[in-house]
Amino acid sequence: MRQALPLVTRQGDRIAIVSGLRTPFARQATAFHGIPAVDLGKMVVGELLARSEIPADAIEQLVFGQVVQMPEAPNIAREIVLGTGMNVHTDAYSVSRACATSFQAVANVAESLMAGTIRAGIAGGADSSSVLPIGVSKALARVLVDGNKARTTRQRLTLFSRLRLRDLLPVPPAVAEYSTGLRMGDTAEQMAKTYGITREQQDALAHRSHQRAAQAWAEGKLAEEVMTTYVPPYKNPFAEDNNIRGASTLADYAKLRPAFDRKHGSVTAANSTPLTDGAAAVIMMTESRAKELGLRPLGYLRSYAFTAIDVWQDMLLGPAWSTPLALERAGLTMADLTLFDMHEAFAAQTLANLQLLGSERFAREVLGRAQATGEVDDAKFNVLGGSIAYGHPFAATGARMITQTLHELRRRGGGFGLVTACAAGGLGAAMVLEAE
């Protein structure tokens, strides 16, 4: 094992995560229909600051992410600063790392804290799958640009006369990987076939996720970390995730048809995470700054790792690559963990990564490591359910996982937790957290 890389400032301060909050997550076109991601981000950051009672000028940086970009608000981070009453001089910039976007935001704030350029910052992300940037065809886009430069009405009419009816149709956002043309679900199907993951195994994991999430809500475990929201026309509050199917049975999952490989597939809408709207954020500080403000941190960031693999085959294996690296940098092994939380993009992807984490052959032949990362104990794995149940607003999921894991560690008396996610482009992310 290589030497651990401690995440501390020059003064030896640990990186503290003081608090975290999210909106309830809503299925596409339901509770947050028509609410853009920037407004969801303002909601969660505004409420997070109000609850924390931290002086507004104490926050020196905000790093926020958005995967489904909105052309009218390209820097969502700065818009949140301007729309929440934060100090207008607060540094703010936006990041995007697909489904690991808020992992990246947290890492960036941590690096600013370690560099000593700030003492407190906010990291997070928001996405809306209900407010989408609907584009135009390439032919129409070219004519619009050329028409803007045309000098006469006749020239403009000539340009538009070249268009066909199909050129006028709206173009929805791409759902496939740009470099391969493969959808995420196609990759999940690849992984199910490569690693021999059955439909029954996938449905069982999805059912487990929903049951555990429903239980977490019923026991009040999420109440402190999920805000109540009010959206136009402001008649009814929205306080709980609306994707969780607590009353479902395994027989219900078996009824659905494959969504991607219609003939031979096993990936369905029920064993995949749905399109979702929501936002999440965390407040981060140096340990000494938290003490100055009289705050007890939720926990600390012990290590993080980002990895990348090829996109043509089984590209959602990021957790199998990033987990051993994050553990190594933390100076820990799988056995040292109290909790292990993995983003469930698809049940097939989740099960494939779990399989490879325990594989000696994968460790030796692919990772070049002497031994497997380690089997994940089911008693430590996604103990409150995962993304299949809660939903997945792309840029918000990492911050949700971090906050949720730290709260659960505190309930268990402290310890170490690892959160990890796959992401489009063959990317992976993992972070080791510590609570006392």
UniProtKB/Swiss-Prot annotation:
Keyword Lipid metabolism: yes
Annotated compartments: Cytoplasm
Gene Ontology CC, one term: cytosol
SUPFAM superfamilies, per database record: Thiolase-like
Record function comment: Catalyzes the final step of fatty acid oxidation in which acetyl-CoA is released and the CoA ester of a fatty acid two carbons shorter is formed.
HAMAP family assigned to the protein according to its UniProt record, in alphabetical order: FadI
Protein's name in the database: 3-ketoacyl-CoA thiolase
